[in-house]
Regions:
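N-terminal anchoring/stem segment of glycosyltransferases
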Residues: 1-39, 179-193
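A residue-level signal for conserved active-site and pocket-lining positions in enzyme catalytic cores
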Residues: 9, 16, 50, 63, ...
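Short, hydrophobic beta-strand segments that form beta-sheet elements in well-ordered domains
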Residues: 13-22, 58-63, 80-82, 156-158, ...
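Catalytic core and acceptor-binding pocket of nucleotide-sugar-dependent glycosyltransferases
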Residues: 113-192
């Protein structure tokens, strides 16, 4: 998947940077930054990698594909730009997850270099107050995004354009700039190259 993401970024005229751990194979022709973080929660490790790398740019999940040049986004005035979920997601217990996590962490555009470290700090501070290990929660990044982004100059981008979920082959993705192949969608990613 990371290779397909990198290829899609190159097709738009940009050079991707691959952030990964010390074990994962690099991507040929791609600048790679390795981080020695351990632990099982990939979301927490990703937050730590982003905060340590901490450069202005667009951070994408590896199961995404860029369809159009994203330079116009970086031309906007913001500290952070996030994709806002446009539909309600209710869990089996009836909890409105969209209210708790209005942004998808798969797409994060950053100009303010204090933002990514502030996300990590927020998780640590919150877990110390609540006496719970938030680093073990799969959605710790998305819960944190809403809290920390609310204190910044935030641009909300439509998820249907900049973080469109693709689950099957042949979907109409003509208006989408970035595709996201979540869960079983990963199985069809190659058909969108």
């Amino acid at each position: 998947m990371p290779r397909m993401l990198a290829e899609s970024i190159r097709k738009t005229g940009h050079n991707p940077v691959f952030l990964t751990d010390n074990k994962t194979e690099g991507i040929e022709g791609c600048e790679t930054y390795r981080f020695g973080f351990t632990g099982e929660n990939v979301v927490w490790k990703r937050m730590l990698c982003y905060a340590e790398y901490n450069q202005e740019g667009i951070y994408l999940d590896s199961d995404m594909m860029v369809m159009k040049n994203l330079e116009p986004i970086m031309a906007l005035d913001f500290d952070v730009a996030l994709t806002k979920v446009s539909h309600q997601i209710i869990d089996p217990k009836g909890v409105n997850l969209t209210a708790l996590m209005p942004y998808n962490g798969g797409f994060i555009a950053v100009k303010d270099k204090t933002f990514l470290p502030a996300m990590v700090r927020h998780v640590i501070d919150t877990q110390n107050e609540a006496d719970v290990d938030l680093t073990q929660y799969w959605y710790c990044d998305q819960m944190t995004l809403a809290e920390v982004a609310g204190t910044r100059n935030l641009v909300e981008l439509p998820v249907k354009i900049y973080n469109k979920t693709v689950k099957k082959p042949g979907m109409d993705v003509s208006g989408a700039w970035v595709l996201h192949f979540k869960g079983r969608g990963k199985e069809v990613m190659e058909s969108y190259q």
